[in-house]
């Protein structure tokens, strides 16, 4: 029996991870959604009822002591992520945590270090990596040389003073697709004071260590909600429309073009036929893969440092840096 606990029962838990865990428990019978925890009692109790958790708690240490789970999902605000993650890992519990894995290199390193010392697995839930259309894109590219990647992340009316914790999705996804860390990025900020203090559209231009040229548009104050990716390789051009939050591109698509010929056309509904957001957006696969790896007794996963560069670049956005150079 694989026992799972959740810490944090807010919006992200309810929209993405909760439905994914409910489906996982239904498909893998030897699974117990044992406990969920939130500082707000009503939130924990409602989450337990909605997604089939056995018990609700307001103190995570009490929950872990009583249940002794096989895996913990940490879904809390980024300001608390590193501190809580380190505490959970030091107690010896494998952990999957919502991105970002901290606000800076030091917080990420603390999580990675705690996991290494405890000898337990930790995964950061960068769900774009597990989106079926992104997985299909990487599969089609194969060994082709990637020349450039353009990623457009648009939102409507997002007046966040700090958009970096959303921006990190695009930053990590481009690095993941390129299979190479960034070498440098120039950052341009289109300040929009009429929309609110610190509100800005952000544009990143640079290159990876492998030579791929990247352009990333992070537009919280746009006209719609969508995410689109274009990739040119030495053999083909790829266009991806991601289906987040049932947006204008849902259920999404992937097209491979060579000259005037469309060689591949994949609909998002072919890869996630259930049409559920948590499947289309990668929440299900990132959780399922982690739990099944634990169940199979696989080697220890510690991918936290794999996301440290995205955290550093997000921190540059937060601090309004004009340039990022890899160390």
Residue ranges and their predicted role:
Residues 7, 71-73, 120, 289-327:
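C-terminal helix-rich "cap/oligomerization" subdomain common to oxidoreductases
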Residues 40, 50-112:
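Beta-loop-alpha module in the N-terminal Rossmann-like domain of NAD(P)-dependent dehydrogenases
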Residues 154-225, 230-232, 305:
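Rossmann-like dinucleotide-binding domain that binds NAD(P)(H)
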Residues 101-160, 322:
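A contiguous active-site-proximal alpha/beta segment in oxidoreductase catalytic domains
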Residues 209-286:
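NAD(P)-dinucleotide binding in Rossmann-like oxidoreductases
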Residues 1-51:
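N-terminal Rossmann-like dinucleotide-binding module
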């Amino acid at each position: 029996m694989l026992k799972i606990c959740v810490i944090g029962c807010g919006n992200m838990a309810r929209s993405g991870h909760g439905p994914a865990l409910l489906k996982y428990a239904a498909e893998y019978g030897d699974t117990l959604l044992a406990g969920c925890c939130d500082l707000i009692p009503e939130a924990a109790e409602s989450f337990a009822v909605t997604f089939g958790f056995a018990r609700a708690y307001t103190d995570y240490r009490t929950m872990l002591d009583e249940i002794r789970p096989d895996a913990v999902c940490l879904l809390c605000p980024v300001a608390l992520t590193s501190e809580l993650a380190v505490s959970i890992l030091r107690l010896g519990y494998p952990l999957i945590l919502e991105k970002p894995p901290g606000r800076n290199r030091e917080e990420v390193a603390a999580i990675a270090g705690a996991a290494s010392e405890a000898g337990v697995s930790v995964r950061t839930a960068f769900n774009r990596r597990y989106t079926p259309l992104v997985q299909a894109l990487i599969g089609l590219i194969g060994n082709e040389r990637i020349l450039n990647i353009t990623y457009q992340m648009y939102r409507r009316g997002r007046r966040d003073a700090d958009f970096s914790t959303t921006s990190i999705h695009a930053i990590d996804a481009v690095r993941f697709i390129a299979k190479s860390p960034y070498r440098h990025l120039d950052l341009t900020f289109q300040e929009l004071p009429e929309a609110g203090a610190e509100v800005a559209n952000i544009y990143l231009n640079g290159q990876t260590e492998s030579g791929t040229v990247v352009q990333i548009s992070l537009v919280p104050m746009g006209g719609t909600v969508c995410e689109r990716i274009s990739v040119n390789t030495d053999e083909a051009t790829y266009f991806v429309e991601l289906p987040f939050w049932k947006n204008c591109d849902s259920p999404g698509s992937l097209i491979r073009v060579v000259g005037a010929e469309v060689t591949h056309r994949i609909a998002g509904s072919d890869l996630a036929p259930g049409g559920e957001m948590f499947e289309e957006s990668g929440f299900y696969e990132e959780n399922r893969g982690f739990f099944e790896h634990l169940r199979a007794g696989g080697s220890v996963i510690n991918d936290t440092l794999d996301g440290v560069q995205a955290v550093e670049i997000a921190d540059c956005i937060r601090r309004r840096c004009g340039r990022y150079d890899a160390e």
